[in-house]
Amino acid sequence: MEDFVRQCFNPMIVELAEKAMKEYGEDPKIETNKFAAICTHLEVCFMYSDFHFIDERGESIIVESGDPNALLKHRFEIIEGRDRTMAWTVVNSICNTTRVEKPKFLPDLYDYKENRFIEIGVTRREVHIYYLEKANKIKSEKTHIHIFSFTGEEMATKADYTLDEESRARIKTRLFTIRQEMASRGLWDSFRQSERGEETIEERFEITGTMRRLADQSLPPNFSSLENFRAYVDGFEPNGCIEGKLSQMSKEVNARIEPFLKTTPRPLRLPDGPPCSQRSKFLLMDALKLSIEDPSHEGEGIPLYDAIKCMKTFFGWKEPNIVKPHEKGINPNYLLAWKQVLAELQYIENEEKIPKTKNMKKTSQLKWALGENMAPEKVDFEDCKNISDLKQYDSDEPEQRSLASWIQSEFNKACELTDSSWIELDEIGEDVAPIEHIASMRRNYFTAEVSHCRATEYIMKGVYINTALLNASCAAMDDFQLIPMISKCRTKEGRRKTNLYGFVIKGRSHLRNDTDVVNFVSMEFSLTDPRLEPYKWEKYCVLEIGDMLLRTAIGQVSRPMFLYVRTNGTSKIKMKWGMEMRRCLLQSLQQIESMIEAQSSVKEKDMTKEFFENKSETWPIGESPKGVEEGSIGKVCRTLLAKSVFNSLYASPQLEGFSAESRKLLLIVQALRDNLEPGTFDLGGLYEAIEECLINDPWVLLNASWFNSFLTHALK
């Protein structure tokens, strides 16, 4: 059959048919009958249009040997055979210029004389059956249908055959010839039987018995029966005036569509109040590491051994004292907790064999810090359901907080490069499918750009601490286990390095459900003086615990070393996601890939190498009050990664809501920029939904302020 098609039809028609099949993922070599049917249909469409023109008086004429001087316009616009995007562009342009109703499905032709779209059908079955299927599918009075068969029959809407007898006879003769040629090669029977009907779902299958009763029970309000509802749905035209559609849906809905212009949107209102505070599970830019290079000590890789080794690299310990108390906490308990950690580590060192894990003594300060015995007693509902004034606790509204500059600094810092590499090349996972080497090449380029990024350090730190906490929570439920906060990296010279950020002490952890909370106390080293931005550290008690000698350009200087202590909590599900923070690498790699794909499709070749190696080109990174910020491709990779990492570190219901709701406004603004003339109703309600999420979360507030910068520049 394939050979027959290639011999029987014009090469241009064959090429168009192949293209159409590929667009739908079909193979002309396998689905040969379909290949023949598409070629036949294309040829009929072209023959329908051939030789038909409109002269300068607007009359329809047939010209077979063209007079080059005649001012003639083609009578038919051919839509069939174009790729979908182009075809719809042609249809839209016809509808805009002629005011003809836009069809739901792509028609085959447009007749400029009769001002109507035409659907051409070629069938191997009865013409009237095929006609009904087409009419049922299109469901439009406006599109004219004309069906031809291989036996010389035809059928058209209202018996209006559009063309003269001779033109139609030419088409019928050609179809008859194709049929005979196929028959002589023994191909006709298979071709005739392979025709499937128009793929519409049979609409009227009967529902009986239980399903019928359930259907009647589950109707929307105001409908008495399933028939009543079906009739309403069948009569519902999806196109047309939106206001009418809404009022048709419900009498209560009354929406006026307002045009959305450059002057329409206002900036988001950010909350007032004291500045927002740090709420991440561990310190980010303020963290300080005690490190050992090329670790080779006994028990290397066992966290407690590594931690003790790191602690020994520091000699400036001093008697700790509180420099910034926690407003609501019993601060001496935090001080005692740190002293206890030091004492117990000292005790371990004096033992002959260091244990692999360390459970802290359950002292009063740790019981207080970990909320031991603080949970309200659970009472069986049966025992208290008769109490008349049983009620849920009143909970206060969260206090509103304003945006503080520290969160932007945190983000900027996360985008920076460090002098160590935090991931090996294979951290993103090996190729599974043989997707050539393009995927590996992209991954390697991307990894090179982000392996030294501070956001990548946060990923590895997050993965480590969450894994260790979840393990301890399951393995030592009743114990106050001491968990060192550790990360590993490689220096510029490729030497291995183990870092200690501080310690976590885990509380009781009988975690049955995903959301059950385990309390922990974190104690983290830092050189940041908390008195510079006290509001950032509202949830912390900060101790001064030592003096550190730092090498600077002017020689060695001594700086106080602080310990940031706070009570915190997490759950199984949060730890599970924390353990999977490496996904952030994948998410940002995919965003970069879509940028490369866009470039590649324009240039029609893979642009991976050029994309990463053209150092002169800059790319948009984000919006700031100064305008659109641009940077190198490496900076783009690191910024996208930092955004993904912060979405994980600062995950919250406020962020979920803000992302979902602000996206709607973003799409409307994008539509305006693309000159699509968007209309909206209840824009105030959308603003309300967005601003409801702006309460006190630093990352959400920063995103909202970026959104405002975007609005300002997008609408200039």
UniProtKB/Swiss-Prot annotation:
Compartment(s): Host cytoplasm; Host nucleus
GO BP of this protein: cap snatching; DNA-templated transcription; symbiont-mediated suppression of host gene expression; symbiont-mediated suppression of host mRNA transcription via inhibition of RNA polymerase II activity; viral RNA genome replication; viral translational frameshifting
Gene source species: Influenza A virus (strain A/Duck/Germany/1949 H10N7)
UniProt keyword annotations, A-Z: Cap snatching, Endonuclease, Eukaryotic host gene expression shutoff by virus, Eukaryotic host transcription shutoff by virus, Host cytoplasm, Host gene expression shutoff by virus, Host nucleus, Host-virus interaction, Hydrolase, Inhibition of host RNA polymerase II by virus, Manganese, Metal-binding, Nuclease, Phosphoprotein
Cofactor requirement: Mn(2+)
One GO MF term: RNA binding
Record-given protein name: Polymerase acidic protein
HAMAP family named among the record's database cross-references: INFV_PA
Recorded name of the encoding gene: PA
Record has Phosphoprotein as a keyword: yes
Source lineage: Viruses, Riboviria, Orthornavirae, Negarnaviricota, Polyploviricotina
